[in-house]
């Protein structure tokens, strides 16, 4: 059974999962990894979830305020051996529910063209592709997405 726990970026399980995420992205992004890494710092993220299978941390994600009503989904990751089991969807839906509780009405995110499984997850969860925002404007390998959040 999967349990999703709310925490913050000081959580050691979250930090360990993010280390694995960064290793994966370093391979996928190649030379562009340094650009993306600059926007993926976790020190000040107050809203983090970690998914556990029994006592094993298997996935994570975070939300970060983008504007008064908009949150940004950050640091989504599931261990490879646990993918395809609904964990990423559970993490995402928990983050969205938390965002609604905090008063946000919209969610945005950036993922990479080299992450087709992430793009499929977000599309399946109701996200639509939007023009690249903020620091991702003009970045060829970025895919930005958005979803209206409802209670």
Name what the model sees in each region.
Residues 78, 84-97, 124:
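Conserved acetyl-CoA-binding loop-helix of GNAT-fold acetyltransferases
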Residues 2-74, 79-80, 92-93, 132-135, ...:
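Acetyl-CoA-dependent GNAT
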Residues 92, 99-110:
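Conserved GNAT acetyl-CoA-binding A-motif
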Residues 7-10, 105-108, 112-125, 131-151:
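C-terminal "cap" of GNAT-fold acetyltransferases
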Residues 55, 59, 86-88, 126:
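Conserved phosphate-binding and hydrolysis motifs of nucleotide-dependent enzymes
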Residues 69, 85, 101-105:
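Short coil/turn segments at alpha/beta junctions that flank glycine-rich nucleotide-binding fingerprints
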Residues 17, 21-24, 98, 121, ...:
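Alpha-helical interaction/dimerization surfaces of two-component signaling modules
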């Amino acid at each position: 059974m999967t349990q999703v726990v709310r925490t913050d970026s000081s959580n050691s399980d979250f930090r360990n999962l993010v280390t694995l995420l960064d290793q994966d992205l370093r391979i996928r992004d190649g030379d562009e990894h340094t650009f993306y890494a600059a926007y993926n710092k976790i020190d000040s993220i107050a809203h983090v979830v970690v998914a556990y299978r029994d006592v094993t941390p298997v996935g994570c994600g975070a939300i970060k305020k983008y504007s008064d009503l908009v949150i940004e989904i950050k640091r989504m990751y599931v261990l490879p051996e646990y993918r395809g089991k609904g964990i990423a969807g559970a993490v995402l839906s928990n983050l969205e529910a938390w965002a609604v509780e905090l008063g946000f009405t919209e969610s945005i995110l950036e993922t990479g063209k080299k992450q087709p499984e992430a793009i499929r997850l977000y599309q399946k969860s109701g996200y639509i592709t939007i023009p690249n925002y903020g620091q991702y404007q003009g970045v060829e390998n970025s895919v930005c997405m958005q979803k209206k959040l409802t209670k």
